[in-house]
Amino acid sequence: MTIVNVITIDGPTASGKGTVAHKVADAVGFHLLDSGALYRLVALASDRAGVDLADIDSLTRIASRLDVKFGPDRVWLQGEEVSLAIRAEAIGNRASAIAVHQPVRDALTQLQRSFRKLPGLVADGRDMGTVIFPDAQLKVFLTASVEARARRRYKQLIDKGISANIEDLLRDLEARDARDRTRAAAPLRPAEDAKLLDTSDMTVDQAVAQVLEWFAAVRPDA
């Protein structure tokens, strides 16, 4: 049977997992799955449709019918490019609230697993190593102090031309962390066999180099 290598990179908001995953995927020539973007797409689509966050049936229906296309640093929803729209903080907060619902997560599970194709996949999110790809060859869990993550998020937003307040971001991150860790559906936690990587005082390149070193040691087709 053909082995499709998978590297999972999980962690809290603004831990650097998206940037690290992108660079690792480029380095090894694998496909990339930004699972958080899927929840943001559900958040955006449901917000535009005026769906209440408590309406689980409608949220699940939107998730199961998600018409999405990914390109290099770009995302389309029903043919409309929404790369910038899904990165708004309000949409991120809405996505975090939506992600607590198990039916929504179930609706997105098969879509996420469909990204597992040759030559391999790097998947970033919050439950990639624990739920979506429990048999991944390498599981990484990124951590960073909430202060370091708030600074990173602030820079990301400002660089994209989105206004931001670092004190508000700090509060939002703390609230999201609490929600992600305590939710009943796939709470944020490292897989038992995950490699832990604290990026608080690391550059992106240092984090990428560490992940690549770990993968070289376990890659079955090396």
From Swiss-Prot:
Residues the entry annotates as binding ATP: 11-19
Catalytic activity: CMP + ATP = CDP + ADP; dCMP + ATP = dCDP + ADP
InterPro entries linked to this entry: Cytidylate_kin (IPR003136), Cytidylate_kinase_dom (IPR011994), P-loop_NTPase (IPR027417)
Primary site of residence: cytoplasm
Domain of life: Bacteria
Subcellular location: Cytoplasm
Family the UniProt entry places it in: Belongs to the cytidylate kinase family. Type 1 subfamily.
UniProt-recorded name of the protein: Cytidylate kinase
Organism whose genome encodes this protein: Cupriavidus taiwanensis (strain DSM 17343 / BCRC 17206 / CCUG 44338 / CIP 107171 / LMG 19424 / R1)
Gene that produces this protein: cmk
